[in-house]
Amino acid sequence: MSAPSGRSPRLDAPALRDLVLDPGSWLSWDSPIVRGEVSEEYAAELARAAEQTSQDEAIISGEGRLRGRRVAVVAGEFGFLAGSIGVAAAERLIAAVERATDEGLPLLAAPVSGGTRMQEGTVAFLQMIGITAAIARHKEAGLPYLVYLRNPTFGGVLASWGSLGHVTIAEPGASIGFLGARVYQALYGEPFPQDVQTAENLAEHGLIDAVVPHEEIADVADRALRVLAARSTWHLDVRGTEHPPAEDGTDADDPEDGRSAWDVVTASRREDRPGVRRLLRTAATDVVGLSGTGAGERDPGLLLALARFGGAPCVVLGQDRRGQSMSAPLGPAALREARRGMRLAEELRLPLVTLIDTPGAALSREAEEGGLAGEIARCLHDLVVLRAPTLAVLLGQGTGGGALALVPADRVLAAANGWLGPLPPEGASAIVHRTVDRAGEMAAKQGVRATDLWRAGIVDRVVPERPDAADEPTEFCLRLGRVLGEELAGLLGRDDTERIRTRLHRYRHLGH
């Protein structure tokens, strides 16, 4: 049967499994279903569902290989009573999650469901708790959990295992929501608004990371797992990257090159200066873009991604110069999205790289009512105590609290034309001198240059620009990528307790 326009054709659980996993690698974990006493009517429904689908429940579970990597899989079968979850289906799902956790396997989930199985009532409804608890333990063990939402996914399934992924993607055109349209109309006497409960709309609002057709699932999952599951193998992947060329700059190199503070500020504002997107395209591998807070917010001023530099895995938080403008400056949602990235790094014990490049956070009623100041505070709080290794880079403009929110890392790097200040120099000049005409003088006095920050012990290392990243974008991005690979390898090799103690000591004694 053909699918409606824009929607992927429906695949049953075995067909989707076989499309994603390496041929011949599937091993089922399913045990025979054991049910308590049920009504004759329900027993007949179960028998018909089993006959129609050749499955004994709405969940299949097992393991296989994805591009050679061993993974655990749980998938829904919509043909079995609309994929609804009752006690037996939940038990199979929970047992599979627990086994994946015990065996240290990444878990791939492919929900498709109308929700809770109404024939089993409240006891089925409460299975959401047990499922969620099992997934929470899996994530607490530092193991990846990837979710592919299929058409349709509703109710208790979306409100439990469908919404807990480290990475969440969905079928094109999939209907996804909490309350189904038919139930809504029956309860409220009017149709549910169109085009709300769609995969594309959820992606637009930062609730899922991407819309991905069936044939691309394996590639996206493989790239994600190359990063998410790499903490235990990083030492094999970074061999040869620990010592980049001397011309890339080192901690000990005095970065003074005679640029004035105003020259640096001006260079950082060039329209053609490479930003986070150019850096990822040029110097990173296994990049998987993520999107939004997962809670209904998305800010184009912040880019969240998984990536590797020189083989070292990391979560990337980059302030995107192309996504910020006078009409759409960096807002509180961007910082909430940044905090999602911090949580991801923490859960998976991955390094976090922050790339700072902002003309400043939003100054508006919406930003104030959206809690901008509080989000800056929470970013600072989370970064300072984050157990994951952290690396900050002043890539360009570093204006105000929006920049500061991503600074307090284990190691801080700066591009030669990167800078950091409490306000734009023009703003500082207006406060002190009641005119913007002395902005260059204020920039010099405030010590905003990468060179000044290095001398003050705020920046550990300055990455050269020859003479300006905008004039050598590819070469600069490759240079910075090599440095990031070296720095990440160094951070991954340090003892966590010592590293965090050193970080806290560093920021306690800044300026002394």
What label would you give each PLM region?
Residues 154-161, 177-178:
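Glycine-rich anion-binding loops of enzyme active sites
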Residues 176-179, 184-187, 421-424, 428-430:
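Nucleotide-binding motor/catalytic cores of P-loop/tubulin-like NTPases across gene-expression machines
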Residues 1-146, 152, 164-167, 171, ...:
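Terminal-region recognition feature
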